[in-house]
Amino acid sequence: MGLPWYRVHTVVLNDPGRLIAVHLMHTALVAGWAGSMALYELAIFDPSDAVLNPMWRQGMFVLPFMARLGVTQSWGGWSITGETAVDPGYWSFEGVAIAHIVLSGLLFLAAVWHWVYWDLELFTDPRTGEPALDLPKMFGIHLFLSGLLCFGFGAFHLSGLWGPGMWVSDPYGLTGHVQPVAPAWGPEGFNPFNPGGIVAHHIAAGVVGIVAGLFHLTVRPPERLYKALRMGNIETVLSSSLAAVFFAAFVVAGTMWYGNAATPVELFGPTRYQWDQGYFRQEIARRVDTAVASGASLEEAWSSIPEKLAFYDYVGNSPAKGGLFRTGQMNKGDGIAQGWLGHAVFKDKNGDVLDVRRLPNFFENFPIVLTDSKGAVRADIPFRRAEAKFSFEETGITASFYGGSLNGQTITDPAQVKKYARKAQLGEAFEFDTETLNSDGVFRTSPRGWFTFGHASFALLFFFGHIWHGSRTLFRDVFAGIEADLGEQIEFGAFQKLGDPTTRKTAA
């Protein structure tokens, strides 16, 4: 059959056995990719520094998804939370990866079997002897099973009743760990940052799915609805499946880009809005103010700030930095973080404290501008030296460090002060190793950015697929040129007036 490449799926029309075979093969490919990708990531992952070199800085994609479901330890004796000499048993990163590869092999064999033995009696309508599928019944079966899975995931895995729970953390991504989570049934369950809502909604959605599945298994659709929605056509199944998938893809693109309950900061990196809104900066300032109010010096207050929290307050960790087509992990851009230099406080020769205006997300270059408490510009490093109105040399800018490796030091050399002002524009100042990975200094996005872009793109593609196949199945008669109310084949010359049966010609 001379089919063009874009029509090859026609071969599984009216062939339920091979329709199952291609779905089994697709699932085999997905499971095989997941397992293989996990082993590849484990081969290149460096677990030595969970604070400054976490998995999201190293470009890990499948490991964070395993970790958020409770798999955090390796047969290599390490854990992503920093512990060593751990014994995870079977459910380690490697164990889960191997399980996926074994599953992929079994699914491959099942696909081959169903491709060879396609003509099963199971798929034959006993009344007609033709291959047929009871699609409404299959819809009920799938709905029931997916509801059961959804309910079980929430009621057992996430709740800890029979499973590890899920990854939870504080609002600033410092204390992340896996623990059982109780469902939140009240209004607090609708807080998008509350993990208890995830558990409750899986249980509730699972119950709805189970009930709806049983309903569709026991109640047949009305004939008018069956015909109106083309429930007997396999392309209707394709269209509605595409709708479900594109809707889910849009939802997860949104939760990945905006939220961090299901996509924790420790595993996927910060969101861009946390940089835009100075989220971590405000928390650091609050902690410092609280410590100073309790009698601590500035050096002591800043030294108490966790390095992990300071590292989040750095623009290079924002997923909005770095273009979509810059390949590679974040560490290939600015380098591997080595340590926090400390918080730089800039002052002019009059002793006024100045603030470095921070780099906005969507700028690659930005002039260094230092403003006073009223927002007036007091010093700058413009793009062109000839345009400098408030040079560091003239205004006598100094940089004093609190916390970090430079704690207590004051820098007065203008060249060095400019260096640290450039770092301060990017958030908290860190030292980076750019040699190990030959980092090029151009920011990369995090797996949070890749996931969002990929799912938003495919959601749009699948949306058009839904419209296309939905139109084909609803208006199949129109596209085929056969109208529903056409009673007989019209032949030119059959009527004196074309199409008017009252003027039918009679044989002479």
Swiss-Prot record:
The keyword Transmembrane helix applies. Binds multiple chlorophylls. PSII binds additional chlorophylls, carotenoids and specific lipids. One of its GO terms (biological process) is photosynthetic electron transport in photosystem II. The chain crosses the membrane at residues 21-36, 101-115, 140-156, 203-218, 237-252, 457-472. InterPro entries: PS_antenna-like (IPR000932), PS_II_antenna-like_sf (IPR036001), PSII_PsbB (IPR017486). Keywords: Chlorophyll, Chromophore, Membrane, Photosynthesis, Photosystem II, Thylakoid, Transmembrane, Transmembrane helix. One of its GO terms (cellular component) is plasma membrane-derived thylakoid membrane. GO terms for molecular function: chlorophyll binding; electron transporter, transferring electrons within the cyclic electron transport pathway of photosynthesis activity. It holds the Pfam family PSII. Gene3D superfamilies: Photosystem II CP47 reaction center protein (3.10.680.10). It is found in: Cellular thylakoid membrane. Signal peptide: none annotated. Its main location: membrane. It is a multi-pass membrane protein. The keyword Nucleotide-binding does not apply. PSII is composed of 1 copy each of membrane proteins PsbA, PsbB, PsbC, PsbD, PsbE, PsbF, PsbH, PsbI, PsbJ, PsbK, PsbL, PsbM, PsbT, PsbX, PsbY, PsbZ, Psb30/Ycf12, peripheral proteins PsbO, CyanoQ (PsbQ), PsbU, PsbV and a large number of cofactors. It forms dimeric complexes. Belongs to the PsbB/PsbC family. PsbB subfamily. NCBIfam families: PS_II_CP47 (TIGR03039). One of the components of the core complex of photosystem II (PSII). It binds chlorophyll and helps catalyze the primary light-induced photochemical processes of PSII. PSII is a light-driven water:plastoquinone oxidoreductase, using light energy to abstract electrons from H(2)O, generating O(2) and a proton gradient subsequently used for ATP formation. This is Photosystem II CP47 reaction center protein.
